[in-house]
Amino acid sequence: MAELLLGVNIDHIATLRNARGTAYPDPVQAAFIAEQAGADGITVHLREDRRHITDRDVCILRQTLDTRMNLEMAVTEEMLAIAVETKPHFCCLVPEKRQEVTTEGGLDVAGQREKMRDACKRLADAGIQVSLFIDADEDQIKAAAEVGAPFIEIHTGCYADAKTDAEQAQELARIAKAATFATSLGLKVNAGHGLTYHNVKAIAAIPEMHELNIGHAIIGRAVMTGLKDAVAEMKRLMLEARG
C-alpha cells in the first residue's frame, strides 16, 4: 500500500485576494499554515489568464515552502519556460480553456503523444517530476507511461459530481481499476478534482493512491473553521481510511 500524501491547493486564497485587488489574504501565508497543519505539499495552478495565482506567487512560494511545490499548468511554451526557470518539485500538466470555471476534464495524452513526450522530457531535464492529469481511462494511462511521465493524477470530477450512489460507486470502481492498471505499468498515482470531506475517504482507501490534491473544499471549510483545522481534518480522514 502506497504512502498517502495530501497536497493542498491554495488557488482560492488568491481568488479571494484578487476579488478585491488587495494584498490579502496571502497565499504564501496560507501555504505556511497548511504545512504546519500536516500538508505534505502545496499545489498552485498558474493559469494563462492569471485569474488567481500570479507569477510572483509562484516565485515566492518556490523560495519559501518547507514541503514540496506542485505547479499545475497548461502545456504551452510560456508555462514550460516558467517551470524550467522556477524549478518546482513537481509539475502537473493539465488541459486549460479560458472560459472554464475550473479544469473540466483530463488531458488527451493519447492524441498528442509527441507534444506530451517533449514536455515531459524538457521538465525532467530541468530536474522536475511530471504528472499528467488524465481521466481514468486505460488508453490515456498507457499513453502517459509511453511519453515518460512518472506520475499520473486521475481526474475525480465524475466521481465527485455523481448524482446517485450507484453512479458514484461505478465511478469509484473505474478509478480503482485505473489506479491498479497504472501501478502495473510502473506509474505512481495521484488523484484530485472535486474531492470533499464527504467523498474523500473512498478515494483515500484505494491502496495505490500516492497523493490527493484538494483545494476548494479545504478553503471553503477554512472560511468556517480556520485553515489549520480544515487541513488537519482532511489529513485525518485520509489516514483513517487506511486504518
Swiss-Prot record:
The record marks E153 as: Transition state stabilizer. Pathway: Cofactor biosynthesis; pyridoxine 5'-phosphate biosynthesis; pyridoxine 5'-phosphate from D-erythrose 4-phosphate: step 5/5. It catalyses: 3-amino-2-oxopropyl phosphate + 1-deoxy-D-xylulose 5-phosphate = pyridoxine 5'-phosphate + phosphate + 2 H2O + H(+). SUPFAM superfamilies: Pyridoxine 5'-phosphate synthase (SSF63892). One of its GO terms (molecular function) is pyridoxine 5'-phosphate synthase activity. Gene3D superfamilies: Aldolase class I. 3-amino-2-oxopropyl phosphate binds at N9, R20, G194, G215, H216. It comes from the Bacteria. 1-deoxy-D-xylulose 5-phosphate binds at D11, H12, R47, H52, T102. InterPro entries: Aldolase_TIM, PyrdxlP_synth_PdxJ, Pyridoxine-5'_phos_synth. Keywords: Cytoplasm, Pyridoxine biosynthesis, Transferase. The keyword tRNA-binding does not apply. The active site is at H45 (proton acceptor), E72 (proton acceptor), H193 (proton donor). One of its GO terms (biological process) is pyridoxine biosynthetic process. The keyword Cytoplasm applies. GO terms for cellular component: cytosol. Pfam families: PdxJ. Belongs to the PNP synthase family. Catalyzes the complicated ring closure reaction between the two acyclic compounds 1-deoxy-D-xylulose-5-phosphate (DXP) and 3-amino-2-oxopropyl phosphate (1-amino-acetone-3-phosphate or AAP) to form pyridoxine 5'-phosphate (PNP) and inorganic phosphate. HAMAP family: PdxJ. PANTHER family: PYRIDOXINE 5'-PHOSPHATE SYNTHASE. NCBIfam families: pdxJ, PRK05265.1-1, PRK05265.1-2, PRK05265.1-3, PRK05265.1-4, PRK05265.1-5. This is Pyridoxine 5'-phosphate synthase. It comes from Escherichia coli O6:H1 (strain CFT073 / ATCC 700928 / UPEC). The lineage of its organism: Bacteria, Pseudomonadati, Pseudomonadota, Gammaproteobacteria, Enterobacterales.
